[in-house]
């Protein structure tokens, strides 16, 4: 079947569902869709993700959410019980085997974790644990819960998660393929995520609003805002077509105050612009700001500075929520104590800037207009390639290099675009590849980069890019020689 941005019919969905539920033994727990609906209807309002986001947006507050997940359910429950005292929203980060649908290996990881008395997986294997165990998790905790993962084919995970009482689901057919996988085709991942979104849409039709969040940071490495914005908007459109009504579009901090504030503000405005221009009006929109996703310094004091800076910018830019980091980021998966330190530092800063939204200024306005022009140029070409169909257009756009994510592993990603910082730390385009930015915009990027090159007395080359990638872990933003 040729990929199209068209709502799956009930028969199409149910026929596919029969096969999805057979991919692991716990699929039998969710054969009765109505059972999942009835369980979701028992969840109180204070534990519903979409309501928490809606309330925060109305009140102008920025909510905090960490990342966290371990192999065994009892330990995971204890971890989240500890974290919920310091955050507004809770995660369940999924392990790497589940992300690749390698459930047998996840089962081995559970066994080894039991034997070792500590987690041997980098997340919670929800599919292996099944509905009963996961319902124990959602019933024990008192904050809204979201599944955070990185799964190109997240269909069975979605089924078990929703029937278990999670009320938000991160990811998308682009953002959980291009940065995470090498050999998964976009046709397959987008189609598999149409199933996930249709599942959420079916819950919506039964009065259950599930929040959906495309993954904004992508590779987390020098991502120009227009690239992540374009993909977030595409995934939002794909979700809306399948009946999703609560969308959170995301963005990963780049470190430039002007560009980060402009990015969050333009992301919300552009999402409304495209959603409404394509006929979607009945939806709730929120934004998420991811604290710095690149390399961290090993020194905890320096790490706290990065965490606090991210929280400050998230709050001042008006983001609905911020995904926090820990001072152990350079060392690997953080302990609960380190995670709490990151949450506390973030909350202190969020409280201090709560009434201090970043004021309008010419520099931010110029950056907003630049990002909007770039996104429109890219998305217009994507729609053109697909003859108006955003799903088909996306596949063709990646084939043509029109959509191109820096430093991504996917074979279907051109990898020709090369970003670099300008003299103020904003992310600019050094080499555009086939990304269809207008000449005047490319000239502007060239001028920004040339200004930095003159200041540093060197040519803008790949070495400058490498220096920028390593800069923050070396206590700088710009990779000066």
Curated annotation (Swiss-Prot):
Where adenosylcob(III)alamin binds, per the record, is at 69, 122, 179, 296, 325, 329, 333
Coiled coil ranges (UniProt) are none
Question: Which InterPro entries does the UniProt record give?
Answer: Cbl-dep_enz_cat, Glu_mut_E, Glu_mut_E_C_dom_sf
Which positions bind L-glutamate? 67, 99, 148-149, 170, 176, 180
EC number annotated for this UniProt entry: 5.4.99.1
Gene Ontology biological process terms from the UniProt entry = anaerobic glutamate catabolic process; glutamate catabolic process via L-citramalate
Q: Which reaction does it catalyse?
A: (2S,3S)-3-methyl-L-aspartate = L-glutamate
What is said about its interaction partners and assembly? Heterotetramer composed of 2 epsilon subunits (GlmE) and 2 sigma subunits (GlmS). GlmE exists as a homodimer and GlmS as a monomer.
Instruction: Give the protein name, as stated in the record.
Output: Glutamate mutase epsilon subunit
Q: Which organism is it from?
A: Escherichia coli O157:H7
Annotated gene = glmE
């Amino acid at each position: 079947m040729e990929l199209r941005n068209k709502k799956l019919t009930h028969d199409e969905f149910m026929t596919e569902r029969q096969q999805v539920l057979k991919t692991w033994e716990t699929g039998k727990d969710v054969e009765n869709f109505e059972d999942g609906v009835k369980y979701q209807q028992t969840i109180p309002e204070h534990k519903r993700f979409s309501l928490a986001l809606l309330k925060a947006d109305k009140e102008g507050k920025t909510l905090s959410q960490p990342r966290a997940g371990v192999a065994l359910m009892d330990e995971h429950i204890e971890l989240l019980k500890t974290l919920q005292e310091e955050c507004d929203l809770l995660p369940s980060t999924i392990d790497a085997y589940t992300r690749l649908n390698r459930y047998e290996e996840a089962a081995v990881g559970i066994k080894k974790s039991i034997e070792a008395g500590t987690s041997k997986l980098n997340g919670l294997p929800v599919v292996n644990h099944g509905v009963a165990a996961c319902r124990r998790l959602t019933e024990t905790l008192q904050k809204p819960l979201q599944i955070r993962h990185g799964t190109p084919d997240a269909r069975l995970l979605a089924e078990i998660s929703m029937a278990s009482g999670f009320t938000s689901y991160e990811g998308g057919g682009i953002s959980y393929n291009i940065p995470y996988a090498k050999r998964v085709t976009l046709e397959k991942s987008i189609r598999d995520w149409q199933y996930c979104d249709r599942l959420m849409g079916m819950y919506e039709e039964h009065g259950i609003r599930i929040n959906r969040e495309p993954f904004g940071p992508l590779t987390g490495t020098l991502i120009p805002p227009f690239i992540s914005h374009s993909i977030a908007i595409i995934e939002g459109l794909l979700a809306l077509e399948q009946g999703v009504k609560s969308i959170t579009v995301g963005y990963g901090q780049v470190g430039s105050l002007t560009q980060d504030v402009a990015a969050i503000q333009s992301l919300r405005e552009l999402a409304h612009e495209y959603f409404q221009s394509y006929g979607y009006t009945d939806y709730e929109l929120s934004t998420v700001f991811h604290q710095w996703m690149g390399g961290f310094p090993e020194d905890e004091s320096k790490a706290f500075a990065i965490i606090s800076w991210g929280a400050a910018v998230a709050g001042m830019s008006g983001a609905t929520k911020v995904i926090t980091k820990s001072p152990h980021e350079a060392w690997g998966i953080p302990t609960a104590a380190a995670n709490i330190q990151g949450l506390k530092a973030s909350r202190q800063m969020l409280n201090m800037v709560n009434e201090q939204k970043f004021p309008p200024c010419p520099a931010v306005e110029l950056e907003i207009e630049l990002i909007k022009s770039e996104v429109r140029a890219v998305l217009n070409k994507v729609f053109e390639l697909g003859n108006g169909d955003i799903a088909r257009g996306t596949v063709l756009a990646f084939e043509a290099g029109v959509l191109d994510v820096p430093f991504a592993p996917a074979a279907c990603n051109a990898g020709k675009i090369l970003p670099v910082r300008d003299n103020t730390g904003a992310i600019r385009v050094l080499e555009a590849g086939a990304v269809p930015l207008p000449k005047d915009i490319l000239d502007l990027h060239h001028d920004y980069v040339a200004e930095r090159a003159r200041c540093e007395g060197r040519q803008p080359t790949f070495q400058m890019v490498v220096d920028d990638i390593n800069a923050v872990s070396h206590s700088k933003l710009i990779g000066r020689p």
